Amino acid sequence: MRFLYACFVIVLCALIFCEYVADFVVLQKCKWPEIKRKKYVDDPLRAMILADPHLLGPHRGHWLDKLYREWHMTRAFQAASRLFQPDVVFVLGDLFDEGDMVSDKQFQEYVWRYLKMFHLPPGIPLISVAGNHDVGFHYKMHPFFMSRFESYLNNSSVNLYTIKQIHFVVINSMAMEGDGCMFCTQAEDQLKNISRTLYCMKYPLEAECARTRRHPYSQPILLQHFPTYRISDTMCEEHDAPYIEAFRERFHVLSKDATDMLGELLKPRLAFAGHSHHFCHSVNRLGIDEYTVASFSWRNKVNPSFMLATITPDDYVVSKCKMLPQQFVFNSYLSAGILCLIVIGFQLRKCIQSRRQSSAVDHRKVNYLD
């Protein structure tokens, strides 16, 4: 029975390590990047940015796949939030895999699972951006999908958030089609309003800015689901896509016109996006740093990651934090299984040797009696 006990201990240790400890061990290698300029160093904003968790719905994927991958996303996020204690968390779209396919009741269950998985302590905002799997691509967008996303997750087509004097503009990429549709017109109007708000922050003494709430001006940071226009990941200074594919405007990335419009109206200093499921750091069409954030889910990325950004009104530093790779967990369980087989094989060998010795002794006794 000792070998069964040994196998039980081996499997239990592998289980506890992989399911409860490994995330902390891997994530401890990450640290908040440090701002070198001294003006705002005492109180920078620390933002954790992730993308594309793709929580499975009732139609796609096996229930066991959904259970296990979502368990690991929960463990990874809770480990990260405890270790890093961010000031704000942004999720850059495709929160759900079937958000544009489910009924209102199923969507409510989706939101409940999402908020449970990405639960944060009081006082830390979770800002969720709409993705094409949440409300549909432009051709599929419907007031019903849009209104329920806005209602449950408190985010409309375009929003301006100001946290610690840092301005974030959150955009619904699917409303950047520029074809004059209801959603596009509404989004463009909201962008123009935000542009005026930012202008009044910069020039508060202008006559048209008399009634505007006054915040110190700094160039905004752009957050959306689609990256701004680029031909492919060949334009990235660094990336982790396993292969390069050409991007289509309005499907993989924003169009040139939409990208230029955002640059003209907002004049951002930094941009973050998701959608491609792979990491990319590029200097985009607007001449600013853009980070495409890899998927947070093992279902889309076997080596997922997220971003840690330290930001002040006049500076920023961004670093990539690698999460627990799926292959590491599989290899750990495989190693535990092989170790168990070795223990069992060793025990069987001992049993066989013991029986042979016992048989030899019995044979000698029989010969002695004869």
UniProtKB/Swiss-Prot annotation:
Instruction: State where the protein is found.
Output: Membrane
Cited Gene3D superfamilies = 3.60.21.10
Necessary cofactors = Mn(2+)
Q: Fetch the SUPFAM superfamilies from UniProt.
A: Metallo-dependent phosphatases
Describe its membrane topology.
Multi-pass membrane protein
Q: What EC number(s) does this enzyme carry?
A: 3.1.-.-
User: Which residues participate in a divalent metal cation 1 binding?
Assistant: D94, N132, H225, H275
Q: What class of enzyme is it?
A: hydrolase
Q: Which GO terms describe its biological process?
A: endoplasmic reticulum to Golgi vesicle-mediated transport; GPI anchor biosynthetic process
**What Pfam families does the record tag this protein with?**
Metallophos
Q: Where are the transmembrane segments?
A: 7-27, 328-348
| The record's free-text note on cofactor binding | Binds 2 manganese ions per subunit.
Binding-site positions, a divalent metal cation 2: D52, D94, H277
- Belongs to which family? Belongs to the metallophosphoesterase superfamily. MPPE1 family.
- Functional summary from the UniProt entry: Metallophosphoesterase.
Q: Could you tell me what this protein is called?
A: Metallophosphoesterase 1 homolog
The species this protein belongs to is Drosophila melanogaster
Gene behind this chain?
PGAP5
